[in-house]
């Protein structure tokens, strides 16, 4: 089991006693109880009983500022050491022997790489702890799909707060458009409007031309009709004048005869 491997590979004696005390505090289940725990619970059980140093008073009234936290390397056991011991114990169990901590630390990256080969990526200590924590959170939280209807969803996308409401699966999305695309769309709309305006102008012009042509045709027909009526009236007047003519008799005048006069004596 994991706990037994950690206890076997750990060199300090107080760590083994802490693990035994923590296992006894869990109900006396022995190795079965420790086997079901993860690295976080083991570390929490180990460092839970460590005393915190008291802060001395300055002048009897105010406490001194807290001391800086000890370095991770100066701690008795760190999470990386426990992880290396676990992976080293796994290598030793596979080889049939016990591997010292130094060899376990050297073999830890290879074991981690082998464990992550099944998924196509290497697994680190942070990934392992995050996966274990995510499993526990998924087991603790139960989500209800029907309860998510009509609730307000808030989140942060690229540093900007996004707020939206779920309304029966329908949502209105406003897409941001590139300025060049917007300008091209405006030019296209303007071109369409210009074409529509030109088409309307052509239609009005054609209608006006057709109206003028019809008016000219009507005037030509009326003019021809008036000329015909005028000619008919002239012919009728001439005929009436011929019928109502007055006969005129012209007498022939006789020529004056020359005769001898007695105006002069010889």
UniProtKB/Swiss-Prot annotation:
Gene3D superfamilies: 1.20.5.170. Pfam families: bZIP_1 (PF00170). Residues 184-248 form the bZIP domain. Residues 202-244 form a coiled coil. One of its GO terms (molecular function) is sequence-specific DNA binding. GO terms for biological process: abscisic acid-activated signaling pathway; positive regulation of abscisic acid-activated signaling pathway; positive regulation of DNA-templated transcription; positive regulation of response to salt stress; positive regulation of response to water deprivation. Keywords: Abscisic acid signaling pathway, Activator, Coiled coil, DNA-binding, Nucleus, Stress response, Transcription, Transcription regulation. Residues 212-219 are annotated as: Leucine-zipper. Residues 187-205 are annotated as: Basic motif. One of its GO terms (cellular component) is nucleus. Induction: Induced by anoxia, drought, salt stress, oxidative stress, cold and abscisic acid (ABA). Induced by D-allose. Its main location: nucleus. Disruption phenotype: No visible phenotype under normal growth conditions, but mutant plants exhibit increased sensitivity to salt and drought stresses. Transcription activator that binds to the ABA-responsive elements (ABREs) in vitro. Involved in abiotic stress responses and abscisic acid (ABA) signaling. Involved in the signaling pathway that induces growth inhibition in response to D-allose. Plants overexpressing BZIP12 exhibit increased sensitivity to D-allose-induced growth inhibition. PANTHER family: BZIP TRANSCRIPTION FACTOR 12 (PTHR22952:SF392), CAMP-RESPONSE ELEMENT BINDING PROTEIN-RELATED (PTHR22952). This is bZIP transcription factor 12. It comes from Oryza sativa subsp. japonica. The lineage of its organism: Eukaryota, Viridiplantae, Streptophyta, Embryophyta, Tracheophyta. The gene is BZIP12.
């Amino acid at each position: 089991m994991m706990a037994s491997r950690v206890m076997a590979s750990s060199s300090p004696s107080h760590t083994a006693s802490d693990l035994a005390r923590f296992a006894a505090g869990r109900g006396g289940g022995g190795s079965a109880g420790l086997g079901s725990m993860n690295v976080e619970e083991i570390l929490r059980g180990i460092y839970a009983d460590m005393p915190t140093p008291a802060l001395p008073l300055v002048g009897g009234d105010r406490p001194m500022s807290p001391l800086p936290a000890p370095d991770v390397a100066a701690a008795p056991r760190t999470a990386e050491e426990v992880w290396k011991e676990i992976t080293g114990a796994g290598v030793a169990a596979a080889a049939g022997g016990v591997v010292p901590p130094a060899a376990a630390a050297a073999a830890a990256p290879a074991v981690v790489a082998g464990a992550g080969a099944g998924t196509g990526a290497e697994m680190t200590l942070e990934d392992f702890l995050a996966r274990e924590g995510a499993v526990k959170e998924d087991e603790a939280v139960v989500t209800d799909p029907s309860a998510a209807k009509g609730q307000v969803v808030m989140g942060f996308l690229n540093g900007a707060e996004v707020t939206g409401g779920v309304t029966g699966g329908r949502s209105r999305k406003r897409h941001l458009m590139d300025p060049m695309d917007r300008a091209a769309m405006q030019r296209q709309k303007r071109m369409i409007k210009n074409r529509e305006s030109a088409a309307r102008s052509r239609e009005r012009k054609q209608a006006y031309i057709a109206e003028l042509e019809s008016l000219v045709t009507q005037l030509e027909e009326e003019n021809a009709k008036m000329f015909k009526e005028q000619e008919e009236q002239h012919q009728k007047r001439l005929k009436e004048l011929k019928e109502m003519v007055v006969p005129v008799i012209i007498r022939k005048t006789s020529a004056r005869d020359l005769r001898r006069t007695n105006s002069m004596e010889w």
